[in-house]
């Protein structure tokens, strides 16, 4: 366990995995407040509910394109670009004045999640084989579940102050970026595939 977690690339991939849970359920505690704030907008109830499902729709549509982009531009670069776009699009809801614009930002967020998920999964395949990959997948599931619990709980707390503060949680990706950059780009070494024997 400790050998795997001492690999900063493994830790970076776990951090990236923890972001993906943010895309949908995190804003759920803020939905009633968002709908109330934009009650004068036509179809506000429908648009508010689409804020949750829009990212998943874009992930489904863009995942194949993200796979091609990862092969074309590099998985590490796509991961970093995805995390940056994730942070910017996700946190945009704090300042956008219109429900339609917030929905548009959620669609862009889905594109970012497709970038992160696709490149992260590809890098896991590059870096780990056999038992090491199995152990990593277990850690990834734990990181995702723990991230979901923490982020949703924190979102509920923030929504008690202001519903739009929930969108600030997406900026956590900006805190991850320096570590991700150090893990994947600073060394200039490509990921290596570990094989038995």
Feature annotation, model-predicted:
Residues 9-39:
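Extracytoplasmic
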Residues 25, 56-64, 148-149:
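Residue-level signature of mid-helix packing/kink "hotspots" within the transmembrane helices
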Residues 31-60:
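Extracellular/periplasmic helix-loop-helix junction of adjacent transmembrane segments
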Residues 34-35, 69-70, 154-160:
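Interfacial helix-cap and linker-helix signal at transmembrane-aqueous boundaries
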Residues 60-98:
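Conserved MFS/SLC helix-loop-helix module at the cytosolic interface between two early adjacent transmembrane helices
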Residues 83, 87-90, 105-106, 171, ...:
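A generic transmembrane-helix signature of 12-TM secondary carrier transporters
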Residues 99, 105-144:
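Cytoplasmic helix-loop-helix junction between adjacent transmembrane helices
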Residues 139-184:
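Helix-loop-helix hairpin linking two adjacent transmembrane segments in secondary transporters
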